[in-house]
């Protein structure tokens, strides 16, 4: 067929070659914004759903069950609490609910896909995954894809915003209520934690990386110099070593604001559109992802839902969509 005469596909149709066996996927919305100072990420799960997540995943042969949203507290009805860890009680309560839902999804043989919400929800998501595999005497790996390290604690945080603390909680540095969700800490061994794409990191977070014993940290400079494929191959090997598989925690501010404008804490110099897709495609190629979450989509400051649309595209790539 000559170029330019191809039939136009309906807007609701998607093409893609499946690289993964069909999965049963459980979508869990966590519309939490108490961990961030900028409001709006509580609408992230709805924006991602409106962008066609379910149809995209089903077009790849996966079975999708949407569990709806977890009920969360709103700032207008709660006291901020300790200013060094704002709304910590409410965030811990929400993350505990998320952890339980994620664990139940895995018990039912489903792959959890969690939609945030700010990045504090990861303290719940990863706790649920770690609990499920711990009961089988197995460990998990963690791929943390983010412009920020999220390794602050109440003692080091300049803002008191808990969305800057979830990775610290997961490796056992605190805050203690988040670190001990479902009764144990740490959730992930430091040798199986990989941070990718960081480019805005506090001095105290650098110290906490060393304290925690995390050695696999790839900055945007590493990606620039060595390429996304090399970085991802090394990262997945480290996260997968001696584990049942790994959780993917993707903060949309990892991507350059030119392509993902609808995030609460944008940082120039992020991953390009194609770099982000390549990272997800390599994750799909390896086939060892046990759970996935995408966070910090903020429709209030987005441009025509571009960031949510991209979030759906990236989830699709992580679940097997290919160009050819």
Q: Residue ranges of each PLM-predicted region?
A:
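Catalytic cores of soluble, metal-dependent hydrolases
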Residues: 2-32, 38-113, 125, 132-135, ...
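Active-site histidine-anchored catalytic micro-motif
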Residues: 107-181, 190, 286-287
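Active-site flanking residues adjacent to catalytic metal/cofactor-binding acidic residues
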Residues: 117, 145-147, 196, 248-252, ...
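Active-site environment of divalent metal-dependent phosphoester hydrolases
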Residues: 152, 201-203, 299-301
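A general structural motif
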Residues: 174, 194-202, 230-232, 272-277
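Internal, active-site/partner-interface "lid" segment
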Residues: 180-188, 192-198
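Short gly/pro-enriched beta-turn/loop segments at secondary-structure junctions
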Residues: 187-191, 212, 241-243
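Short, glycine/polar-rich helix-capping loops at beta-to-alpha or helix-loop-helix junctions
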Residues: 201-211
